């Protein structure tokens, strides 16, 4: 997943609703919520960002092996850690690259992080002054700047069922 305000959580909620309507057990691991409760001891260094994703991936693994569909709505900037999670999940990893230009994310930003970064009050914003390594071969690319929410949710839904 890419930048903040790209549409990750909104899409995850749409997919979650469909899964619940099917009677499936489902959990969303949202990056902001996880940072509030599970990884609040971590900062935003490379090592801390990697550890954040590893912890989220481990929780997702535990839930998944117990029959829960897990939707991880997180900024995961580094390819090598995403690859580690793919191995951990052994065939149950489905990467959706929410491809949204930074200017669109900035326009959607309700927390004002992009404005703070632009004003010099915030550093380390993924994709701006901290690197983001796009996936090489994700299972699905969702360009939220050219699709409606409904189209994005439908694309994920169809890909999961193919």
Set out the residue ranges of the language-model regions.
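Small-molecule kinase domains that catalyze NTP-dependent phosphoryl transfer to phosphate-bearing small molecules
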Residues: 99-102, 107-155, 159-162
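Conserved beta-strand scaffold positions in the cores of enzyme catalytic domains, especially
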Residues: 28, 93-95, 139-141
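Helical mechanochemical/support elements of P-loop NTPase systems and associated helical scaffolds
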Residues: 30, 45-55, 81, 118-124, ...
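Short, small-residue-biased leader/transition segments that mark boundaries at the very start
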Residues: 1-2
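ATP-dependent NMP and nucleoside kinases share a basic, alpha-helical "lid"
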Residues: 37-44, 48, 60-118, 124, ...
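Conserved substrate/cofactor phosphate-moiety recognition/catalytic segment
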Residues: 6-61, 65
């Amino acid at each position: 997943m890419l930048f903040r305000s790209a549409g990750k959580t909104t899409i995850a909620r749409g997919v979650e609703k469909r899964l619940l309507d099917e009677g499936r057990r489902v959990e969303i691991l949202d990056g902001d919520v996880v940072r509030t409760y599970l990884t609040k001891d971590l900062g935003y260094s490379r090592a801390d960002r990697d550890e954040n994703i590893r912890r989220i991936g481990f929780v997702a693994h535990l839930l998944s092996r117990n029959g829960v569909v897990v939707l991880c709505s997180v900024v995961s900037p580094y390819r090598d850690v995403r690859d580690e999670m793919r191995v951990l999940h052994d065939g149950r990893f489905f990467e959706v690259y929410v491809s949204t230009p930074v200017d669109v994310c900035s326009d959607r930003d309700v927390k004002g992080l992009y404005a703070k970064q632009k004003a010099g009050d915030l550093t380390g914003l993924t994709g701006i002054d901290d690197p983001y390594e796009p996936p090489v071969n994700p299972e699905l690319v969702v360009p939220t700047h050219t699709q409606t929410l409904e189209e994005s949710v439908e694309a994920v839904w169809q890909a999961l069922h193919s």
